Structure formats: C-alpha cells, structure tokens
Amino acid sequence: MDTRVLRLTLALVALSGVLADSESCSSAIVNDYKLKQKEIQHLVDTINKPVYPDFKDTRGIIDESKLKGLGTLPRREVFSLFDERNWAEAAKVVELLLEPKTFREFIHLADIIHHRVNEDLFLYALSVAIAHRPDCQGVQVPRVLDIYPDKFLRKEVIHKIKEVSNEGAYLDKVPVIDATEVSDNHLDPNQELLYFLEDLGMNSHHHHWHVIHPAIWLPKHGGVKDRKGELFFYMHKQMVARYDTERLSNDLPRVRPFENWNDPIDEGYSPHLIIDKTGYKYAYRPQGVIVHDLPNLPKTKMFEWKNRIMVGIRKGSLISANKTQVPLNNDHGIDLLGDVVESSLLSVNRVFYGNLHCYAHVIAGKVTDPQSTYGEKNGAMYDVATSARDPLFYSWHKFIDNIFQEHKETLQPYNKDELNFPDVQVDSLRINVANGTYENIVRTYWQNSLFKIAKGFTFTTEGSVLVKVKHLNHETFYYNLEVTNNALEEKHGVVRIFGAVINDERGHPYILNDQRHLVIELDKFTVNLKPGKNSVRQPCYNSAVTAKYDVFYGDVESQKPQEGCNCGWPDYMLLPKGKYEGLRFRVFAIVTNHDEDKVSDQETCLCGDAVAYCGAHNQKYPDKKPMGFPFDRRIDERTFEHFHTPNMIATDVIIKFTGEFLPPKGDI
C-alpha cells in the first residue's frame, strides 16, 4: 500500500519531519534572504574577533535616549540568560531590534547597539530578533558554533590551532587540527561520557533552543509562544533521559537528582574552556563543594520557591499575581508549571514562585567563588552555551523533572479509551538497516567530522582551519510497521516512535512505570491508512526530533532556509551508544488518530525539522496530545504487554557499538 507522508498541513509537514517543498514555501521565505544573510554575517563577524583600527564608532547617529539603560553588563564578560540581573538589558535590546519597520533600519540600529553592549548579550538578542522578525524569514540565525568556537572546543585544541596559525603554514591547503587526540584522563569519572557531554551539536542545540524560546519573551514582542512551558519541561526531560541512557550504555548508574543544596556536589568538573579574545576562563569545580549563598540570593530563598511550587502542585492550583487560583489539573497545567519552574516572564506569579531553575544555574556557576572574593569567573553552568557540558546539569535537571513528575502523578493514568485508536491494529514492528542484511540490530560507531573555523579569530589570524572532532553515529535504519485498518474507510494516523533501555544498572528489567522515565522520543510522523493491510516504512533520517548533520557541520550557505533556527537534537545522536556486546533496547510504536490530534491546517516552512523538541516556530505546536504521550503519566500496569492497546506495539532491538572510526565526509 502507498503510505505517503501527508504534507498538506502544518501538523502533517512538521510531524513527518519533512519540510514543505520550496515552491509552497516561497511566499513565506523572503526573496533576498541570501543578501540579508551576508549583512547579518558581516554584523556578527567581529563579536568574538579583534576589532581592527578601521572600526568607526556610530555615536551620535540616533537619539541617544533610545539607548538609555544599555551597557549595564560589562563587555568581555559572559552573558547568562539564567542570570535575571541581565534580563532587563537583554529584553530592551530585543525590543529595540524588533521595532524597526524595514530590514535596512534593523541592520543600521543593530550596528549601533553592537558596540554599546556586551558582545555575548548582543549575539543572543540579535539571534532572537532574527528568529522572530518577519523580514528575516529564511535568514539563518547566527550559529553559536561559528561565533564562539572556543565555547565548544577545549583550550588545548584552541592552543594547537594557535600554534599552527603562528607558524603561518597555510600555503595552498587549509590545515586540519586533530581534536580527537586530546589526552585522556582516566581519573575523571566522566571521561567515558565526554563524547556526549562535549558534543558540539548537542550543546549547540541547547543554546539555540533557548534562542527560539527565550525566557524573556512576552506576547508584546510578537505573539504567544504556544506551549512554551511544556516544551521547557519536555525537551529538558528528554536530555536527562538521553544522558541516563548513555550512562547505562557505559555501565554507569543513572544520575542522581541534586535536591538538597546543603549536601556536597558529587560531580567535580573542569570545563577546559577559555574565550581566547577576552581570556575569560570558565571556572573549575572540585568534587564535594557545597553551594553557598550569593550576595543577593540566599539558599533559603531557593527552598522557599521550591516549597511554594510543591504546595501548588499538591493543591492542584497556583496563585496568580492578582491572587486568583489557577488550576493545574488539566491539559494546560504542565504548560503553566513549566513557565513557573523555568521561570520565564510568562510565569503566573514570578514574585511569589521566584526563579528556581535559572537561579540554580547561577548559584551553581558561582559555587567556587560565590562572593567574588578572588575574582574568579563563572563555571560552565552559568552559560546556556556551555551548561550542558557539566554533569551537574543533568543532576539538577533531574531534580527539576521530579517536580514536574509530582504534577504528573496527580493526573489519572490514561484509560483504554484514551489510548486506543478504534479499528486500527499494529501487527508488527521491525527495525531494518539500509542494506537489509539483519533485523532488529543497529550498529553504532565513532564518526570523525570536520568543523571549519573562519579566519580572523585571535587563534586563526592567518587563515581558516578545519578541526577534526569525534562524535557518535549510527547506521541508517528504517522502522517497518504492518498496520491493519479494520474500518471501511481511510483513516489518518500519527505514528509515535519511542525507545528505552530494558535493564537497569544491575541488569534487572524495569517495570514499565520506571522505564517510562528513560523513554526517549525517536520520531513522530503521519500516515494514510487504507482499509485492510498497510505497510509503513519510515527512515531514521526524517526524525521529528533531530536536526540534520549539516546544521552543525555544513557551511551556512549550504543550509536550506527552512532550517534556519539551528534547533534540534543532532541526527547522529538519535540512538544511544550501546555496548560492544549489545544494549537491549525496546522500541515502541503507537498509532493515534490524526484527525483528533491535529491542531490546524496551516503549513510550516521555517524551523520545522525538529518540531517534537523545538516546536513549530511562531505557530501552534502541531499536536494536541501531551508531549511524551502515552508515557507522560503514571502507568499502573507492570509490563507493556498489560498496558498496550491494539494500536500499540513494542519490539526489542540490540544496539551494538563497534568501536570503529569512520573518516570525515568529503576530502580533507
């Protein structure tokens, strides 16, 4: 049967992981986006590069009163979206950059602001503006990897680049710096996880997620961010579940939540990061340090905020700023709670519930010098671009997720009617690799890739360089389902694919309610089901949770305008590493009723390739079901076999890590 992926509506396009075709999107993407891209690139080119003598100050060109309040955060410091003290200035810059009526006025104003504010803050605010201005549709949001490679590559690698640059050995070939040879430190308990923690694409995704879902966003900036709070909950929950799965792949126990701020922090961490232009060195955190009060933030305030949120969850309602009760025990409760816990400016009562998530990043980032007694810089947890490198990130976010799970526990488990899709039965699910030689076995391996760093940084004074980095990858595979439609008419379905490790760190199989906390989303796509038997085949590279390889390693010029948000889990990390002997992994497929699940018939053309984690940009989230359905609520049945309805199926897969190294794509 022809199971063509539906591409006529927003939900169809986004959920299938397939972008709308260029002809249908031509009206949404500005015609001159390539020219605008060059102007944006020129604007950001000196953010992290030396400003040369030909720089011309733009003071006096516009009304200075418009710029009042700018420059609060000193230049050469790291801007943190987590630090609320930076919010007023960042929000003002965003508002100023959204205000101009034309692109030319926007660029002119941005050029003026650029030299008045902190460089890092400017990049963030500019990125938010580009992502949300109508005249920038199709223009790439500046890739943080390109602007700040020294936030993603260890100082040892930057030093090697600088050595080659100083030699001037650029002749007729771009030099390749091998970042895979950075010496191992087997005393570090996180050594086995650095491929995940320090992955360029994963950390870039986290940064850009916070660009398109800024905590400082308000409806007056250009509309409501649909289900933003729920997206905060779900995307970060998925990051923790993926990290736990990588730990189990390496025979390490799952991460423990950091929930008592009077206890020593188990995880020590050294970022090995220095911003070369400014000399900003991200602080090292020894194992066993204890979080201390900050000058304006005592730990008791964090306990108070957490307890107030927990009281609201147990009562089933929050107290709004105008003292009314806001119910939580409904479909929108998780969204409201996400805004409160993050806490974004959309929180129902920021004064009362505080800023639990963000300020925990701040207090953790300043843990080695909380009073600034010794002039130490902040740690990786302070910066959105670097925080996911730190193992503490996952301990902290597991604590945050436990708060959300307290809310989910108050909701009734799904009943069979809510789970079932009448007349639809999933008969089989097989996972096949591209060459078709074996079934339900997928192999993973190391992939070497080349990351290009442009000329002009303090460490690339003579020309551009290529850096060879190592990351995880997997062979191409397909989901093959046999689905029976017992009705006499065609049905439209949404196929939801999840996966979870089967055994815990002791080798014992999980009961389903415990296993659901480790479930990672793999894909979500739509199908037409004709009456009778249907064969459904979906490739892994069309996943609705991932961004393509080129989003991270390709040239900006080669990216499609529809991929301009740079948000999405790296496609090469869709699966966990697995084990040499094979990791037992269960893949679940659930087919639900698309006619009930779809939100609208509006087509999406921008940033639609990772909609499950990143949402549909400037539009409604294209799925009415709660994120993570049906694993988002308590499951009383001990096994999937007792839980499932006819429209669900599970199959066991072996993920085998080969240890092989594949060479970089293309010529060196």
From Swiss-Prot:
GO CC annotations on file: extracellular region
GO molecular function, one term: metal ion binding
Species this chain originates from: Scutigera coleoptrata (House centipede)
Full protein name: Hemocyanin subunit D
UniProt binding sites for Cu cation A: H206, H210, H236
Disulfide partners: C567-C614
Xref: SUPFAM superfamilies: Di-copper centre-containing domain, E set domains, Hemocyanin, N-terminal domain
Glycosylation sites: N322
